[in-house]
Amino acid sequence: MIKVTLKDGKVMEFENTTTPGDVAKAISPGLYKKAISAKINGKRAELMTNIDKDCNLEILTFDDEDGKWTLRHTASHILAQAIKRLYPEAKLAIGPAIDSGFYYDIDADFSFTEEMFAKIEKEMNKIIKENLKLERFELPREKAIEYMEEKKEPYKVELIKDLPEDAVISFYKQGEFVDLCAGPHVESTAKVKVIKLMSVAGAYWRGNEKNKMLQRIYGTAFTKKADLDDYINMLEEAKKRDHRKIGKELDLFTMHEEGPGFPFFHPKGMVLKNLLLNYWREVHDKAGYDEISTPIILNEALWHQSGHWDHYKENMYFTKIDEADYAIKPMNCPGSILVYKDNIHSYRELPIKLAEIGLVHRHEKSGALHGLMRVRCFNQDDAHIFMTKEQITEEILGVIKLIDSFYKVFGFEYYVELSTRPEDSMGSDEDWEAATNGLINALNAANLEYIVNEGDGAFYGPKIDFHLKDCIGRTWQCGTIQLDFQMPERFDINYIGADGEKHRPVMVHRVVFGSIERFIGILIEHYAGAFPTWLAPVQVKVMNITDSQVEYVDAISEKLKEAGIRVEKDVRNEKIGYKIREAQLKKVPYMIVIGDKEIKEGIISVRSRKEGDLGSMNIEDFIFRINAEVKEKISSI
């Protein structure tokens, strides 16, 4: 008998070899209808995969991220098949699923345009209706190369030749179409109910600017048209909220061709950035962290010792000083370890919490750069906690609570992923098991539901990722907690235990913002530039109706400044309606209008960005209102 243990702990028994699809049918016809793919012992699998021994099984639907990924992966093959039917001379490169859908890179002697999408989509829908079964088969290396050479697919031939000697070379067939692919896929093309092509762009083969420029067609896929409609509406809203557009309109930051991927923050942007950093420092000071600062350039040998050289060197920048090789840091952890090593530590001191707003540099290909969301230099709010093994659950639980309270201030909901050991990991099986269990215990203690993301941990340890959900439903990975047994070993760091002997501490790497620049980009889009009062670079705009009120505008502005309120004056010779509209466009939370009546009665007339005309009030009541909003960090959208 084969025992299949489901996600809820229920065990089903089968006399003979079965498949996830058969298991789904046995559970209920409704589940099978919704089923997209599966996970067998935590690894992605197809509904057609044979189960011939006891296992843990999870049936995945489109509601699961891995289910979405599988369906959209098949959608990319449907796109490729449609392209080959319509344009047989086109050459296929790669076509993966991505977060928002899928793409396929194509080499053709003509340019694809969005006007051609309707024709391609029509062929894709035809392929879906044909209900073509997806069949997997394998070939030896030489046969695989010969097979793709016969099909005149040079990019596939190159991919096969670059695979390791012992690699399994698999293909997927749907009707007349065959593609080189590792899978997994859905059972048939009919599972992909709704498709839409979104855009076309240039993409260098293998992301290398020295290679040929291909054409990348982007698309997305769903199981319901209503979900596609919601997605299109979200994209339209996202365009309005684009942080690059709003950042320029509000004079927060710019990007320049003199420094691609290196943001320039303007005065108002620095106000916002410093407000976030001040809040971060306030929270971390209360939580017992000590702030440090470490150099951005360190000797290359350090990065060999840390393991970053072997795992991260392609993303690093290098320089020479006095003929010695140095690297610009891509991460803050080695510097924090050197600070820890500067002193002998007792077990009584642990945990030691060292926090740093560190400027890091990571090389990104030019095509991947995107405003503040994908840059080449950014400030990362790292903290490193050095502790005993017995303190793991308690300390990680404390970090989870800190991150939870932090995100709530900005009005974010979030979900949590546990990422496990990757293929290029360092360390023993025992250490990885202990580290992973430490994170699981803390998540359970916090009563947090989490998704397991197999094989996506850091090279030195498993991690917990926090994915923020913004007000239009998009998710952004920001906070991370990583448990590390490897770095303490590599740097030979110790503490003196109660027995007077040296012991190895456990190290936790964690961030809350992640990249502060990226977090600002997320906030701009989350609030559509209309920051809550406590974060607004300009909190109040004071404006006159005629020149006779300029002196009173100056006096009111000074009182507000003395109260710590960020204020600007608008005494231009413009109509008051124009000034109010402009302040609204600049997303200023409050506007004060000064006319003859206000001067005569010693009051101010107040307009709120959100509530409109608030009427007249005295300056003291208005200052109290602003200070209360700032103190309470009200963040309603």
Swiss-Prot record:
UniProt keyword list: Aminoacyl-tRNA synthetase, ATP-binding, Cytoplasm, Ligase, Metal-binding, Nucleotide-binding, Protein biosynthesis, RNA-binding, tRNA-binding, Zinc
Can you say where in the cell this protein is located?
A: Cytoplasm
Per its UniProt record, the required cofactor names are: Zn(2+)
Pfam families per record: HGTP_anticodon (PF03129), TGS (PF02824), tRNA-synt_2b (PF00587), tRNA_SAD (PF07973)
Q: Which residues form the TGS domain?
A: 1-61
Report the catalytic activity.
Answer: tRNA(Thr) + L-threonine + ATP = L-threonyl-tRNA(Thr) + AMP + diphosphate + H(+)
Q: What class of enzyme is it?
A: ligase
Q: Where does Zn(2+) bind?
A: 333, 384, 509
Q: Which GO terms describe its molecular function?
A: ATP binding; catalytic activity, acting on a protein; metal ion binding; threonine-tRNA ligase activity; transferase activity; tRNA binding
Return the cofactor note field: Binds 1 zinc ion per subunit.
Which residue intervals make up region (Catalytic)? Answer: 242-532
Q: Tell me which domain of life the UniProt entry assigns to the organism this sequence originates from.
A: Bacteria
- Which one GO biological process term can you cite for this protein? threonyl-tRNA aminoacylation
User: Could you tell me the EC number(s) of this protein?
Assistant: 6.1.1.3
First-listed, main subcellular location of the protein, grouped into a coarse class: cytoplasm
Q: Which GO terms describe its cellular component?
A: cytoplasm
Similarity comment text for this entry: Belongs to the class-II aminoacyl-tRNA synthetase family.
Role description = Catalyzes the attachment of threonine to tRNA(Thr) in a two-step reaction: L-threonine is first activated by ATP to form Thr-AMP and then transferred to the acceptor end of tRNA(Thr). Also edits incorrectly charged L-seryl-tRNA(Thr).
> What is the annotated quaternary arrangement, including any partners?
Homodimer.
**Descriptive protein name:** Threonine--tRNA ligase
Q: Which organism is it from?
A: Clostridium acetobutylicum (strain ATCC 824 / DSM 792 / JCM 1419 / IAM 19013 / LMG 5710 / NBRC 13948 / NRRL B-527 / VKM B-1787 / 2291 / W)
Q: Which gene is transcribed and translated to give this protein?
A: thrS
